[in-house]
């Protein structure tokens, strides 16, 4: 088994920050901390098993190679791409968001 490193894009980092702030304000510190723990656990799992996510059809997003994986206890999905030696985290988004090519476009991450 190849263990890969996690390489979060700045948008993924901002997503996590925004979600933690939202949960802290809405439901309290304990819920926000539980979200942070779940993100850490999800990243650890993706490091060891990067293929656990589901491919997002190219017709849907017009971007090849993007996978998504839903968190267990929170209604968010991690969007990522497997590289040779690492997993690129693109975004962490609520499924009610309009997840389009513009949301995940590679040009946004350049």
Model feature map: region roles:
Residues 1-38:
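Arg/Lys-rich, positively charged N-terminal/basic patches that mediate binding to nucleic acids
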Residues 18, 22, 45, 49-52:
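Amphipathic, soluble alpha-helical interaction motifs
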Residues 1, 54, 94:
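Residue-level signal for pocket-adjacent positions within structured domains
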Residues 71-110:
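Enriched for short, Lys/Arg-rich terminal
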Residues 40-42:
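Compact soluble domain cores
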Residues 48-86:
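Basic/aromatic recognition patch in beta-strand/loop cores that engages polyanionic ligands
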Residues 32, 54-58, 101:
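Short, hydrophobic secondary-structure boundary micro-motifs
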